[in-house]
Structure formats: structure tokens, C-alpha cells
Amino acid sequence: MTRTITGDVSGALADLGILVPLTAALVVVNGLDVGSVLLIAGLLVVTAGLVFRIPFPVQPLKALTALAVAQHLAPDVIHAAGLEIGVVLLVMSLTGLATWLSKLFTKPVIRALQFGVGWLLVVTAVKLVLKPPAVFVHSPSSRTGLLLAALTVGVVMIAAWRRWYVLSIVLVVVGVIVTLLVEQPSFGGPSIDLPTFSIPPWSVFGTAFVLLVIPQIPLTYGNAVVGVSDLAHQQFGERADRVSPSRVALVCGLGNLVSATFGGMPMCHGSSGL
């Protein structure tokens, strides 16, 4: 496998395509603290790299985020869901259930789940363009948004076909430049605002489980436990010997417990980032 600086930098940006829009939605629509969210996410990325010793994705939970944004759920509900998902994944790992169930997930099942996650993101993105939340005060027209989306998808498909891996770097740079030119944001001075430990009130755990955890767990296990393990071994061979469904579930479970209690967002190891 030939490595280049361009390839490494481009690969390092892979998760941003999922991380940035979903994080922005949870912060703007649901009121999560952006500092806590980004700090915890960064720590989980570093931890995943140290544990698995290969490039390993860390992303927000897609179905959970889509449902939370659509229903404008409060931060306490989202954090409660993160705790519950963390506990479920830990139980699956420590009891051996994660390994046993992985035998039932054949490649067609894994690919179908990955397709479903991708389709969910497409539908959510189109809804945000056609009917943006009221908090998006400077939203472009739906026609402009759909045109930009179609253009971007076309460019990405051509780049993937031609193997222009530098495209992710270009897209990020262009996005930053366009944002600075269009919005002309103001910059404040630096400040230190560390996350604080907190537990959501017990009254929200039932709501979180029904609305967010039940729809998310099958996708998380299929795509971000079994799917990412299968893809890691396919892409990295022997270098992925640390990756297994049980270990991925363990790391993801612990990560969600930490994230939920320190103001972060529910996370997973979605295979799309790998």
C-alpha cells in the first residue's frame, strides 16, 4: 500500500462529511454545547487510533441525529439516549453477544444496512434544504440548495471514479472560503470552557429509549460494529488484527458513556468514514 501526504490528509478529512453537518444540526437545532461536542469527539478519535492502530472512523449516530433534529429534542434526551446505547453496547461486548450475532450478519445484510444509513442521510439532507429549521436564519433558497447538492454529488462521483483523492481537501478549503465570503463571521477572543460532568434526569430515559435508542441500535450494530470490522479487515488485512465486533462494541460503548456524561453527542464507528 503506497502512502502519500496528500492521501493521509485527505483520509483524515473523511469523517468531516458526516461529522460537520450532523454536529452543526445538533448544536444549532437541539442546543448541544459546541465546545463539549467537539472536544469529546476529538478525544474519541485519538482514542480509537490508539486502540485499533489503523485509521478508524468516529461519527455521530446517524438515525439518532436525524430523529433528534426532526423532533427538536432537548439535550437531556439526547444524552440519555447516548448513555443507554453505551450500556447496550457494553453488555453485548462483555457477554459475547456481539461476537455471536456477527455470525448472522452476512455481507448482503451488512451492505443493505449501509445502504439504508446512506439513504437516511440523503433524505434528511433534502428535507433540511426544502424546509430548513427556523434557527437556520440565513438559509439559501431550496432551488439553490438542491442545485449545489446535485453539483457536489456529481463532482464527488467523478472524483471517486477517477480516484482523485485530493478532492476532500479541495472541498473543505472551498467551503471555508465560501463561508467567509458569504457570511463574514466575526471572531472573538479565545476562552477556556471545559465540559462538566452531569447525568440527565431519570424522567427522560424512557422517552430517549423509545424515540432514539430502539431505531438506532440495529443500525449501530450492523453498520458500526460488524460492518466496520468487516471493512477494516478487507482494507487493512493483518494490520486490522485489533479490530473485532466485540472490541468495537466495547470501545463504542465506553465512548458513549463518557460523551453523554460530559455534554458530547452520541457517537459510533460508522463504516462510511473508513
Positions of PLM-derived features:
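Hydrophobic, small-residue-rich membrane helices and short re-entrant helix-turn-helix hairpins
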Residues: 5-6, 162-173, 193-200, 209, ...
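C-terminal ends of transmembrane helices
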Residues: 45-55, 89-103, 153-161, 225-234, ...
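Membrane-embedded helical hairpins/re-entrant loop segments and their flanking transmembrane helices
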Residues: 2-6, 26-47, 215-274
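Helical membrane-embedded segments and adjacent short helical loop/helix-boundary regions
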Residues: 6-18, 55-57, 103-123, 207-211
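Transmembrane helix-boundary motif of multi-pass solute transporters/channels
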Residues: 10-73
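Membrane-embedded alpha-helical modules
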Residues: 72-187
